[in-house]
Amino acid sequence: MKIIFNADDFGISPGAVYGILESYKRGVVKSTTLLANSPAFDLAVEVAKENPGLDIGAHLTLTFGSPVLQGLETLTDDDGRFRRNYTSLENGLADVDMNEVERELTAQIEKILDAGITISHFDTHHSIEPLIYPVQHKLAEKYGVSIRRHSDVSDFGAIKTPDLFATEFYADGVSFETIKKLVQKHIGTNDVVEVMTHPAFIDETLREISSYVEPRIKEVSILTSRELQAYLGQQEVEIISFRDL
């Protein structure tokens, strides 16, 4: 089997940037996805350019912070910020203009490209793929990139995806045992499994803007551990990135 350890939230805070960098340089993370509207976007771009082996994707969002574009009336609240989560976006989806969705997501992609970053794949913040899949699919074809697999879609056409998207390594599931169970389930197959991760060093920026904080430092510890890397080697698990699909 092959595993892609993808680190979400690149740029959400300086601590997240450095936590992901640590998980890449000393651990098993080879891919990460960058938030175009994140507080530490410039730092993330700088780190990405200094580490060309780290595979960069776009972490498309309609639920975090403020949009790249202005005047998106159906996507934002009275303060001009995105609605806060998947549920609030889903509940208001009937009133969302999908043209606004496409324009904003395109702007996020173009901001990353304009910064000199090559994008290999797309995923989304708060896993909103089921709500915007037609737009995401269209943009993936346009930019020639891979996307994160999700269970609501059975036919991805010519777009490359892993065979499975694993979300278990999150919150109370952040443990070495979680990854071992995943490996044992797929060992001996040709499956490509993406494991969602959120490693970060905790800082005040992260505490202020994210509800998922404390487990992130534990993720760094596990993803960089010699024990995990030795186990994956013993099981002949190949660690790859989205570039390798």
UniProtKB/Swiss-Prot annotation:
Q: Where does Mg(2+) bind?
A: H59, H125
Q: Note the Pfam families from the entry.
A: YdjC (PF04794)
**Which major enzyme category is it?**
hydrolase
**Which segment of the chain is annotated as a signal peptide?**
none
GO biological process, any? polysaccharide catabolic process
Looking at the keywords, is Amino-acid biosynthesis present? no
Q: Print the keywords alphabetically.
A: Carbohydrate metabolism, Hydrolase, Magnesium, Metal-binding
Coiled-coil regions in this chain?
A: none
Q: Which GO terms describe its molecular function?
A: deacetylase activity; hydrolase activity, acting on carbon-nitrogen (but not peptide) bonds, in linear amides; metal ion binding
Say which domain of life the source belongs to.
Answer: Bacteria
- Entry annotated with the keyword Chaperone: no
Would you identify the family this protein belongs to, as annotated?
A: Belongs to the YdjC deacetylase family.
Function comment: Probably catalyzes the deacetylation of acetylated carbohydrates an important step in the degradation of oligosaccharides.
This protein's name: Carbohydrate deacetylase
Query: Organism, per UniProt?
Result: Listeria monocytogenes serovar 1/2a (strain ATCC BAA-679 / EGD-e)
